[in-house]
Structures are given as C-alpha cells and as structure tokens.
C-alpha cells in the first residue's frame, strides 16, 4: 500500500500508494480535463471525517466504548467522544451524555484510509451496486453512510458486540460537485451510473 521515497532528513519514508498516484497521474488528468491555468486550482482531498452515532448510549453508557474501540481499529487514531449539546426528554437524553464518536483523518493516515476504503472495504459490502453520485453538498464534498463496521478487515467479526453503521465525509478543495465527483472517481470511488 505504500511506496518508499528517499528523504535526506529522515531516511526512507513510505508514501501512501493513493497519494503517489494522485501526485503522478490524477492531478495531471484533472488539470487537463478542467483546463486549470494554475496548479493550485486542481482539487485535492483535505480531510476525511468518520462519525459513528450511538443513540442507544443514552440508555447504556457502555455502548460508546465499543464504538470507540471499533473506530480506533478502523482508522488507527483515537476517536473523540461526542456529547449531547442539550437535553431532550423524549429521547431520555441529558446534556453532556456521550452519544457518538468521531475521527478526523488528515495527511498520510487519510490517504491510507481512503485506499483501504476503496480497494478493500467497499467491495466487501453485500449487494453493493456503487455509491450514489448525488450525495455531494454543492461545494465538492461527499458524504455517504456505511451500514456495518464489519466491512473493514481490521474488525474481528467474532468480537462484534453489535452492528454499528458510520458516516464518512470526504472534504475536498473542489469548488463544484462535478470537480469533486471527477476527483473521487479518479481516486477509485465506485459511483453507480444513473
């Protein structure tokens, strides 16, 4: 998944495979496709946010530990526990109760996660027909949901206490949805044709 490049200060440092491909092939293709005059106009990936909401944690606080453990295994980074901003009596929710976990990935970890997501995790989804090309937010950012955490190979299926879904947001520097779609398609995101 990584390619090694020579760096004077630290010696050999691995460069994520997808990042290498973006620099060498994808950026040039996008520049040609959208006829950018400046290299800074070429869209790139800024960060990936992985969010796991655990609404049942309001009744059982131990459930949040499983979500934190799963997210840490999937992303390789310690998740931030998200707490309720205000109390809602109908949901038996009090202000400050843990209700989810979130991880923001940047840099090499982000590229490695995207590579694993596209090449390993998404193909493991049962009856997968591709991602919807319409879930862009108008500014080139893409958000989609995954219904179960077992599609990631880091999760041991025998140790799953309950099935949890997650939201994955890919934030890009693209200014339009078409640019963002072209970038993610070039990175290997399997969008279905409508």
UniProtKB/Swiss-Prot annotation:
It comes from the Bacteria. One of its GO terms (biological process) is translation. Keywords: Ribonucleoprotein, Ribosomal protein, RNA-binding, rRNA-binding, tRNA-binding. This is one of the proteins that bind and probably mediate the attachment of the 5S RNA into the large ribosomal subunit, where it forms part of the central protuberance. In the 70S ribosome it contacts protein S13 of the 30S subunit (bridge B1b), connecting the 2 subunits; this bridge is implicated in subunit movement. Contacts the P site tRNA; the 5S rRNA and some of its associated proteins might help stabilize positioning of ribosome-bound tRNAs. Part of the 50S ribosomal subunit; part of the 5S rRNA/L5/L18/L25 subcomplex. Contacts the 5S rRNA and the P site tRNA. Forms a bridge to the 30S subunit in the 70S ribosome. This is Large ribosomal subunit protein uL5. Belongs to the universal ribosomal protein uL5 family. The keyword RNA-binding applies. GO terms for cellular component: ribonucleoprotein complex; ribosome. GO terms for molecular function: rRNA binding; structural constituent of ribosome; tRNA binding. The keyword Ribosomal protein applies. InterPro entries: Ribosomal_uL5 (IPR002132), Ribosomal_uL5_bac-type (IPR020930), Ribosomal_uL5_C (IPR031309), Ribosomal_uL5_dom_sf (IPR022803), Ribosomal_uL5_N (IPR031310).
């Amino acid at each position: 998944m990584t390619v090694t490049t020579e760096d004077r200060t630290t010696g050999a440092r691995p460069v994520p495979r997808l990042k290498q491909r973006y620099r060498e092939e994808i950026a040039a293709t996008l520049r040609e496709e959208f006829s950018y005059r400046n290299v800074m106009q070429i869209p790139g990936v800024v960060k990936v946010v992985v969010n796991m909401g655990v609404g049942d944690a309001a009744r059982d606080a131990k459930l949040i530990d499983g979500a934190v453990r799963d997210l840490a295994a999937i992303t390789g980074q310690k998740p931030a526990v998200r707490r309720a901003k205000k109390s809602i009596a109908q949901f038996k929710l009090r202000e400050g109760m843990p209700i989810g976990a979130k991880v923001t990935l940047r840099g090499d970890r982000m590229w490695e996660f995207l590579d694993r997501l596209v090449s390993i995790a998404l193909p493991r989804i049962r009856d997968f027909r591709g991602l919807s090309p319409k879930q862009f937010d108008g500014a080139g950012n893409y958000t989609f949901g995954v219904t179960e955490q077992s599609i990631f190979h880091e999760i041991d299926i025998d140790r799953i206490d309950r099935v949890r879904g997650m939201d994955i947001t890919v934030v890009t520097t693209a200014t339009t949805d078409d640019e963002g779609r072209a970038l993610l398609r070039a990175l290997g995101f399997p969008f279905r044709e409508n």
